[in-house]
Amino acid sequence: MKTDTAIEAGCHRIAHAIGSASLARYHGDVTRAFAEGSASCWSGYYHGILEHALIGAQTKAQYAAVARRVCSGASIRATVWLAYQCVHGLGHGLMLQSGYNMPFALSICDRLKTDWDRSSCTGGIFMENINAANGSAYGQKTQWLKKSDLVYPCDWVKSRYKLYCYLMVTSRILGANGYDWKATARICAGVEKGWVATCFQSYGRDADGSTRQNASKVLSLCALTGTHEGDCLYGASRDMTSNYSSGKQASGLCAQAPAGLRARCFYGIGTILGNFDSSSSAHEAACRELTRTYYAACLRGTGD
């Protein structure tokens, strides 16, 4: 993949297609299909499985029944990491199978069993909405974007939906403004009260993804955010840890960050590491392997 930039750039959507085909191969067995995949390319494989799982649902009741069932398997719920990939992928599938009917898709997320599931599901919806704007939505279009307001729909949706919308909003902004990072930072600084930090975390996630996890480039982009550099590095370290399913690469980023921001950066790594395994001993071992100086910050991030 590293030798073909076109494939590398589109690997998330390619992985979606592979995941969808895998579910067909295993005759709709979501648990088995999940067991055969990995988190490469920002977990596109997992997301694709859920896109395919909703094929055949027509009524709201049918969508809701499938949505509550597909991510309930014990092996999927074994870790927060896998459960999140499943429920997030469900959000993608709801958008695609409903023809980008965002209010409908959100209403199905609302019918999941827990607050965590409901919130995580919305992330897939907002990511898929942005995919439509950035030309990776299988030819479908969305009406839930505005050229005159690049933050929309985050500044329009109900408060319970805002978190994951703002965690992805800069993908929309950057795609629309030609990756003008300084302009994007200005937009984040001006979003509605209470969501500025989240917008800059999104900026950090995009800094990591757009540079293909190049630590020096991420640091340069985060430096453009001024007083929000810590939020940027937090978002970048989380994204890097998620993409590699490991904190090793992200720890290199954090080690090069400004000294006063390193603890926050390692804390970000910990928030993702904590999802890979539920045991405190595993959290301690993972953080100890990465850093001595910022071990406590990493461990706090895991929830221990």
Identify the role of each PLM range.
Residues 1-304:
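Non-catalytic all-alpha helical scaffold/repeat segments
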